[in-house]
Amino acid sequence: MSNRLKNEVIAITGGGAGIGLAIASAALREGAKVALIDLDQGLAERSAAMLSTGGAVAKGFGADVTKAADITAAITSAEQTIGSLTGLVNNAGIAGFGSVHDADAAAWDRIMAVNVTGTFLASKAALAGMLERHKGTIVNFGSVAGLVGIPTMAAYCAAKGAIVNLTRQMAADYSGRGVRVNAVCPGTVTSTGMGQQLLGSDTSPEVQARRLAKYPIGRFGTPEDIAEAVIFLLSDQAAFVTGAAFAVDGGMTAI
């Protein structure tokens, strides 16, 4: 398909690399203009420049999503540069390990801040214009860890579970005001830094087989798998979809 996002303007947090970059690339192919927002401004700008070929419009901006002034300024700059936002993808996130009894409190706070507070602050900044124009779509990033319990990942499960329910609450607030809100919940995506962190360092065939056994489809995900789901949720093909937690996990949560 093509032009599903024609004339749309999409901001993507964590857009400089990995899944965020794959979403940006897919959105451009579908006719959107994109703003890549990343903690590493240089990375965001380099990635945007790489994508800006053949008339594609991509711009990079730096922001710490845990700081209201930062993310508000980035979204304001994006709107001034490429146009009023019609879509926001809250992709920025971090993971970490630890059960409740041995979790580091500072690490807990940081995981909550980037994942949950970052989603809140970016959404708050984008919603001002979306509600005024009565038009917008927000895609939050949950995870299979927000749908089921994952051993030794207390903070990450709590954060992603919070995002899934925040998505439902936002849909209840804003769907009648022209703004759809959904969450995409990926399974393991091995080619990203977070995916490698979640899988650990043991890549022996026996361990790999045990990991793959959790995925009925027989493989791990790719950034492009997740990007295609996000594009669907951003597009008018999902015009009747709001408040959904969309599992893109190769069947992991089905068994």
Swiss-Prot record:
Binding locations of (S)-2-hydroxypropyl-coenzyme M: S143, Y156, T188, Y215
Regulation affecting activity: Not inhibited by 2-(2-methyl-2-hydroxypropylthio)ethanesulfonate (M-HPC), an achiral analog of both R-HPC and S-HPC.
Site feature Transition state stabilizer, where: S143
Effect of R211A: Severely impaired in the oxidation of S-HPC or reduction of 2-KPC but largely unaffected in the oxidation and reduction of aliphatic alcohols and ketones
UniProt entry keywords in alphabetical sequence: NAD, Nucleotide-binding, Oxidoreductase, Plasmid
Binding site for NAD(+): I19, D38, D64, V65, N91, K160, V189, T190, S191, T192, G193
Enzyme superclass (EC): oxidoreductase
Enzyme Commission identifier(s): 1.1.1.269
Annotated site location: Lowers pKa of active site Tyr: K160
InterPro entries, per database record: NAD(P)-bd_dom_sf, Sc_DH/Rdtase_CS, SDR_fam
GO biological process: fatty acid biosynthetic process
GO molecular function, one term: quinone binding
NCBIfam families the record matches: PRK07231.1
Function of the molecule: Involved in aliphatic epoxide carboxylation. Catalyzes the reversible oxidation of (2S)-2-hydroxypropyl-coenzyme M (S-HPC) to 2-oxopropyl-coenzyme M (2-KPC). The enzyme is highly specific for the S enantiomers. In vitro can also use the aliphatic ketone 2-butanone and the aliphatic alcohol 2-propanol, and shows an inherent stereoselectivity for 2-butanone reduction.
Additional comment: Enantioselectivity is dictated largely by changes in Km.
Family indicated by similarity: Belongs to the short-chain dehydrogenases/reductases (SDR) family.
Summary of subunit composition and partner proteins: Homotetramer.
Name assigned to this protein: 2-(S)-hydroxypropyl-CoM dehydrogenase 3
Protein's organism: Xanthobacter autotrophicus (strain ATCC BAA-1158 / Py2)
